[in-house]
Amino acid sequence: MVFALCGGDARQAELARLLLEDGHELRSWALERAELPGGAKVCASAAEALEGADCLLLPMPVSAKSGLLNAPLSEGTHCLGEVFAAAEPGMPVCGGAIAPEARAVAEGRGLR
């Protein structure tokens, strides 16, 4: 499977390692300061990370502030809507403590 890992902290870096060990392809975005394992593709945009991905992986909690991706290891701030807009309808989304507003946006885009 191809996973797009967007935002998060050291837990997402560990998840990246585990997924790569299991033979999956991994693309990361908004994790510029994370120590990611070799084999992880670092992407310049959410759209690049999500292109052709099978599943979107988000952090826990998904958003630190209303509407913003929880991405303490990123060099900038990112709108959660930017991530959802780049995902294909029907794509599974995994994340923790998803706020009702974020869930509504994802469902409105046809994400599951």
What positions do the PLM features span?
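Short, well-ordered alpha-helix to beta-strand connector turns
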Residues: 23, 52-54, 90
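Glycine-rich adenosine-cofactor-binding loop
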Residues: 3-14, 19, 112
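NAD(P)-binding Rossmann-fold cofactor-contacting core
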Residues: 22-38
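Rossmann-fold NAD(P)-binding glycine/threonine-rich loop
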Residues: 71-112
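Rossmann-like NAD(P)-binding element
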Residues: 45-76
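Residues in the short beta-alpha loop(s) of Rossmann-like NAD(P)-binding domains
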Residues: 9, 30-32, 99
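Active-site regions of enzymes building and remodeling cell-envelope glycoconjugates
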Residues: 36-47, 107-111
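Structural motif
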Residues: 4, 57-59, 94
